[in-house]
UniProtKB/Swiss-Prot annotation:
Its main location: cytoplasm. Residues 1-59 form the Response regulatory domain. Residues 132-150 bind DNA. It comes from the Bacteria. InterPro entries: CheY-like_superfamily (IPR011006), Sig_transdc_resp-reg_C-effctor (IPR016032), Sig_transdc_resp-reg_receiver (IPR001789), Spo0A_C (IPR014879), Spore_0_A (IPR012052), WH-like_DNA-bd_sf (IPR036388). Binds 1 Ca(2+) ion per subunit. It is found in: Cytoplasm. May play the central regulatory role in sporulation. It may be an element of the effector pathway responsible for the activation of sporulation genes in response to nutritional stress. Spo0A may act in concert with Spo0H (a sigma factor) to control the expression of some genes that are critical to the sporulation process. Repressor of abrB, activator of the spoIIa operon. Binds the DNA sequence 5'-TGNCGAA-3' (0A box). It comes from Bacillus cereus. This is Stage 0 sporulation protein A.
Length: 150
């Protein structure tokens, strides 16, 4: 937070995009970081494989690994029918329904949506499987996950 405060006072034409990675999931800390200019907030532990897509999302740049543009007749899905940028779609939907990114349940909700997208059967066992799986990933309890999402 101290770095964000100092960056805020540096006179530049444009403030850089900041991705904040932290183990602290307290709502007040997250809100302060967002207020100070953090563009994206990642709570530890997180999936390292998703970091490049988060960076591209924050920077507003497309995937540089794609060498040629996709033809316009192709849809935005892969061969197995899943969106190419699931995380961006989830973020967009969550923002559309008005869930602020600084609340603790935001990361749990993102994870839950992603897990259900990959395995629709989880909808039949939300409290028995989904919440405990999310709790394991974030090193917390299923009841805390449920409370934060609600």
């Amino acid at each position: 937070l101290a770095v964000l405060e100092k960056m805020r006072h540096i006179e530049r034409l444009k403030q850089p995009s900041v991705i904040m990675l932290t183990a602290f999931g307290q709502e007040d800390v997250t809100k302060k970081a967002v207020d100070l200019g953090a563009s994206y907030f990642i709570l530890k532990p997180f999936d390292m494989e998703n970091l490049p897509s988060h960076i591209r999302q924050v920077s507003g740049k497309a995937n540089t690994m794609i060498k040629r543009p996709l033809p316009s007749f192709r849809s935005a899905t892969t061969v197995d029918g899943k969106p190419k940028n699931l995380d961006a779609s989830i973020t967009s939907i969550i923002h559309e329904i008005g869930v602020p990114a600084h609340i603790k349940g935001y990361m749990y909700l993102r994870e839950a949506i992603s897990m259900v997208y990959n395995d629709i059967e989880l909808l039949g066992s939300i409290t028995k499987v989904l919440y405990p799986d999310i709790a394991k990933k974030y090193n917390t309890t299923a009841s805390r996950v449920e409370r934060a999402i609600r």
